Design a protein with these regions (language model features):
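Nucleotide-sugar-dependent
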Residues: 75, 89-105, 116-124
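Short beta-strand->alpha-helix junction loop in the catalytic core
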Residues: 1-4, 46-49, 180
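Conserved donor-binding loops in enzymes that form glycosidic bonds
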Residues: 18-22, 45, 70-71, 93, ...
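Conserved acidic donor-binding segment of nucleotide-sugar-dependent glycosyltransferases
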Residues: 128-139, 147-152
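Nucleotide-activated donor-binding/catalytic signature segment of Leloir-type glycosyltransferases, i.e.
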Residues: 44, 52-86
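A short alpha->beta transition loop at the rim of the catalytic pocket in nucleotide-sugar-dependent
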Residues: 85, 107, 111-112
Length: 189
């Protein structure tokens, strides 16, 4: 909900970051990273949690430019996002809910450029606030990564739009307030 100034910004932005547990398309991220020379960091969860959340990741065959690290808690996400140049949220298209929201909103709040898969987590919500790519398309993801990595103006413009969007969304207190308001509207005849 609240990020300290130290958590928000870093002078060093030196990799492409991805993480998450629910309905992540890590194979597409890995294949996209094989097509670019930029460093990547994949923050992974316990295998049991990933499997339960329909996420598959093979850490045995990563390209040389991708490092995998095990998630050690929510603060590690903040630390890794802070040092990322780009945050990628690769999502599986076959889900009936919107995964990836917490990762992309946290990254946006930290003024990071986000690349995210088109789907329920983006449709009707995002336009200029993120770079949106087709699902299960490593070539399109690699092209977006290269474009964002090399185009400072695009990266900064998208990150600034994303930051404004994340701030408009509010936070946990706003979410709880909205839930209470909707429940009250439903209960009143």
């Amino acid at each position: 909900e609240k990020l300290s100034p130290e958590d928000r910004f870093s002078e060093v932005e030196d990799y492409i970051f991805t993480a998450g547990r629910s309905y992540r398309d890590f194979p597409t991220f890995v294949e996209a990273m094989r097509r670019v020379d930029y460093p990547g960091l994949l923050l992974y969860e316990e295998a049991v949690l990933l499997k339960r959340s329909a996420t598959d990741v093979d850490l045995s065959n990563l390209p040389a430019n991708v490092t995998a690290k095990k998630n050690e808690g929510e603060q590690s996400w903040v630390d890794y996002i802070r040092r990322a140049k780009i945050v990628v949220v690769p999502l599986l298209p076959s889900t009936m809910y919107a995964p990836g929201l917490s990762l992309y909103l946290m990254a946006m709040a930290m003024k990071k450029c986000v690349i995210v898969t088109e789907g329920l987590a983006t449709r009707g919500m995002l336009k200029d606030e993120a770079v949106i790519v087709a699902p299960k398309d490593p070539e399109a993801l690699a092209a977006a990564v290269a474009r964002v990595w090399n185009d400072d103006a695009l990266r900064h413009r998208t990150a600034e739009s994303g930051r404004r969007y994340a701030e408009r969304c509010g936070g946990e207190s706003r979410l709880l307030s909205d839930i209470l308001r909707v429940c009250a509207e439903i209960c009143v005849p």
